[in-house]
Amino acid sequence: MNTSVPTSVPTNQSVWGNVSTGLDALISGWARVEQIKAAKASTGQGRVEQAMTPELDNGAAVVVEAPKKAAQPSETLVFGVPQKTLLLGFGGLLVLGLVMRGNK
């Protein structure tokens, strides 16, 4: 046997073991978030934060200033090209083909 070729040592870890470890980490992270929320609720900090956060008429948490545009009818796209442009292009190719055929 050639001793220079490394041999792999089998492990007992599988893909599902890695998934389980990841899920455990996520659950423990969420538990930490819930602990912080509970600590804020017990000291009244959550109520103070809620009182300081303005509530808008529409229930949004922040004001969004977006430019207001009138609704335009959506143009049908075929492979990212407007359908009208595509039809005119194919029509032009058809006319060109008929003209070339007539010149034979």
From Swiss-Prot:
Compartment(s) of residence: Virion membrane
InterPro entries, per database record: PM2_P3-like
Transmembrane segments annotated in the record for this chain: 77-99
Keyword line: Capsid inner membrane protein, Membrane, Transmembrane, Transmembrane helix, Virion
One Pfam assignment: PM2_P3
A single cellular component GO annotation: viral inner membrane
Protein's membrane topology: Single-pass membrane protein
Signal peptide (UniProt feature, chain positions): none
Assembly information from the UniProt record: Homodimer.
Name the UniProt record assigns to this protein: Protein P3
Species, as recorded: Pseudoalteromonas phage PM2
Gene: III
